[in-house]
């Protein structure tokens, strides 16, 4: 006998009830999670490899089965019906419970790994960490750490939720290819390759994770480790530098920051897959936008200052310390970089006019202070640029930004603040790519304002908090530093108003003189 439907909605939103297949799939996934929890208080885990294999397969297959039953048997098309009536996706009780659990997990992961079973002082692992020992020894030859546990679960989450995302957006080729790319880079470059490098006694390195997101790349121990690894280590060092100063700017020029934030980055990969149900929770207010601009660029300044101070502290006055770069050469690199920025601004003065006066003066003041303190430290022969020891500064950055902001808040607050909190307010890599995209990239989202019906879907589902509808209503192209080019705004638009395109960089800053909007054509 069929279940009666008491809803009078024409849209037929999800009623919240599950069919038998969905219940079985969720039960299977829950059993996998239960194995992880049960292993917590255990000393040694018998048959750990068998239990771990069963748990991970249960989580992955259960999640995939639920997604298949939810989306595969319905016509292709995006269905976000009832998201504001679901406790999980509208900051309800379930969302708050999940947020607390995620936040608590990250606190334990970063600061109390012993409660997960991490063995210290040469002791063997116990509990959940011991459960992952067989897989870790298979890949790297070493016992598991809390970071291996986290990386494994992180990868499983992106793969299983990525499969769900592909089913949901299967009619959109751009979303399918983009999500497949994220899944590939997470599994291959972020998980498997670094573990295999460790097995070969080579430095552990995620090739796609570049500075300033990888804030320890220029740490002395990391640089020495790569230099001591021979030719391959030298390749890793040069490739990392090329990613920062050559590969990233070129790709951003042609494709915008989406090439990294939506196609490659692991943080963005988790936000796009596991965080997809929460994208509508991003704050679109003007106040949030102002906080975003100051916060993310302040973190970038902090990262640059911290890195410069750290590198300067371990470089010698000559090459006797084993590095190719001396303090004098570092000072020259800083001066040349700033000179290049000034030259670009002189060539394209229109960019400066688009920046608020307070920001311009603040940036010039910070640059002057950095140059002055660096020159003073070099002339006086001191080892600390900013009159503070560099490693405590580095540790403060790692604690506040690398742990609290990116992990505890960035992922723990998914169900409450949306999936891109870290990307919007704290990621220094997003800040660098955003500046390049805003002023030097060919990428933009074009609008056909005459077709806009002001439904607001684009703004609602923008995970970066951009009020896309306001641009569409005025017929303006969207060129925002924060846009990650996920394409969801174009995908949810019922009228085909938005389109991801490339154009001439000269037309990015200044608006078109003629705007075609909802009220007709107007002259600016």
Show where each model-derived region lies.
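Cysteine-rich micro-motifs
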Residues: 481-487
């Amino acid at each position: 006998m069929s279940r009666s439907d008491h809803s009078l909605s024409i849209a037929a939103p999800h009623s919240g009830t599950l069919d038998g297949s969905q219940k079985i799939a969720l039960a299977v996934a829950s059993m996998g999670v239960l194995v992880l929890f049960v292993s917590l208080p255990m000393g040694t885990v018998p048959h750990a490899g068998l239990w771990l294999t069963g748990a991970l397969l249960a989580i992955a297959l259960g999640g995939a089965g639920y997604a298949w039953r939810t989306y595969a048997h319905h016509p292709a098309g995006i269905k976000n019906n009832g998201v504001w009536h679901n406790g999980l996706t509208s900051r309800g009780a379930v969302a708050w419970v999940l947020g607390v659990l995620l936040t608590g997990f990250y606190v334990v992961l970063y600061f109390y790994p012993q409660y997960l079973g991490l063995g210290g002082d040469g002791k063997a692992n116990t509990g959940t960490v011991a459960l992952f020992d067989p897989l870790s020894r298979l890949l790297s030859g070493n016992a598991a750490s809390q970071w291996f546990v986290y990386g494994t679960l992180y990868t499983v989450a992106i793969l299983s939720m990525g499969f769900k995302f592909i089913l949901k957006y299967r009619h959109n080729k751009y979303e399918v290819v983009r999500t497949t790319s994220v899944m590939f880079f997470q599994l291959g470059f972020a998980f498997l390759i670094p573990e295999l490098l460790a097995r070969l006694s080579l430095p552990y390195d995620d090739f796609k994770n570049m500075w300033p997101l990888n804030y320890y790349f220029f740490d002395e121990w990391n640089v020495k480790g790569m230099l001591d690894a021979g030719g391959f280590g030298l390749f890793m060092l040069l490739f990392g530098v090329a990613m920062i100063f050559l590969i990233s700017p070129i790709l951003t020029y042609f494709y915008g920051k989406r090439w990294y934030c939506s196609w490659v980055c692991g943080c963005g990969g988790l936000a796009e897959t596991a965080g997809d149900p929460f994208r509508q929770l991003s704050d679109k207010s003007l106040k949030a936008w102002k906080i975003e601009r100051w916060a993310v660029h302040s973190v970038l300044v902090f990262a640059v200052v911290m890195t410069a101070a750290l590198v300067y502290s371990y470089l010698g006055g000559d090459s006797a310390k084993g590095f190719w770069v001396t303090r004098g050469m570092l000072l020259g690199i800083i001066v040349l970089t700033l000179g290049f920025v000034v030259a670009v601004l002189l060539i394209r003065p229109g960019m400066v006019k688009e920046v608020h006066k307070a920001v311009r003066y603040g940036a010039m003041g910070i640059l002057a202070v950095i140059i002055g303190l660096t020159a003073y430290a070099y002339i006086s022969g001191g080892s600390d640029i900013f009159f503070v020891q560099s490693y405590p500064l580095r540790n403060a950055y790692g604690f506040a930004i690398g742990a609290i902001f990116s992990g505890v808040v960035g992922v723990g607050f998914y169900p409450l603040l949306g999936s891109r909190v870290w990307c919007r307010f704290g990621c220094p890599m997003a800040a660098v790519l955003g500046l390049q995209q805003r002023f030097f990239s060919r990428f933009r989202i074009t609008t056909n304002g005459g077709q806009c019906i002001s439904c607001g879907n684009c703004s609602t589902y923008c995970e970066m908090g951009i009020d896309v509808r306001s641009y569409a209503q005025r017929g303006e192209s969207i060129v925002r530093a924060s846009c990650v080019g996920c394409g969801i705004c174009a995908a949810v638009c019922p009228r085909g108003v938005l389109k991801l395109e490339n154009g001439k960089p000269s037309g990015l800053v200044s608006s078109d003189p003629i705007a075609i909007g909802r009220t007709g054509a107007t002259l600016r």
